[in-house]
Amino acid sequence: MMDPIKTYEIKEEELAKTAYATIKTNKGNIALELFYKDAPQAVSNFVTLAKEGFYNGLNFHRVIAGFVAQGGCPYGTGTGGPGHRIKCEVAHNPNKHKRGSISMAHAGRDTGGSQFFLCFVDLPHLDGEHTVFGKITSAEGLSVLDKIKQGDIIESVVFSSSL
C-alpha cells in the first residue's frame, strides 16, 4: 500500500527562517540555499525531517560519479522513506538540475519522501521530473560534494535564516 500524501501548511515567513541549510557529513559541510518560495512542500518536508533528526547518521546509499549522490533512506538501501510522500513541485518551479542542485528522489510522480540527491553535474534530463529545492552556495561545498562516496554519512542537517 502506498504511503499517504502529506501536505505542509508552514507559512513562508517561517520557511524564511530556514532558508539556508548545512548538511554536515563525515567529509565536511555542504552549505545550501533552499528554494522555499518555488518548492515549499519539498523544503517544508526536508526541514521538518531534519529537525526531527531523521537524517542524522544516514548514509549516501547511491553515489554515481558524473551523476548524483543520493541519501535520506532510513534503511541505507534506497528502499525506505518517512512513512509519507509529498507531491512533486515541478510545474511552476524555475530551478534546473545544475551542478550542486539538491532535488527530491522518487519512484514516480508524487512519491518523494525523505530521499534527496545532489547533482555532480548539470542534469537537464531530470528537469520537470524531480523537484529541485535548493543549491550548494560555495566552492567549498562543491568540493565536499565531489569527495562523497557511497556509504559516507550524513551526520546532521542544521538551518539558519542567512548565510
From Swiss-Prot:
EC number: 5.2.1.8
Any one GO biological process: protein folding
Catalytic activity: [protein]-peptidylproline (omega=180) = [protein]-peptidylproline (omega=0)
UniProt KW keywords: Isomerase, Rotamase
GO MF annotations, alphabetized: peptidyl-prolyl cis-trans isomerase activity
PPIase cyclophilin-type domain sequence ranges: 17-163
Chain segments annotated as transmembrane: none
Record's keyword annotation contains Manganese: no
Summary of the function given for this chain in its UniProt record: PPIases accelerate the folding of proteins. It catalyzes the cis-trans isomerization of proline imidic peptide bonds in oligopeptides.
Matches recorded under PANTHER family: PEPTIDYL-PROLYL CIS-TRANS ISOMERASE-RELATED, PEPTIDYLPROLYL ISOMERASE DOMAIN AND WD REPEAT-CONTAINING PROTEIN 1
Family in the record: Belongs to the cyclophilin-type PPIase family.
Name of the protein in its database record: Peptidyl-prolyl cis-trans isomerase
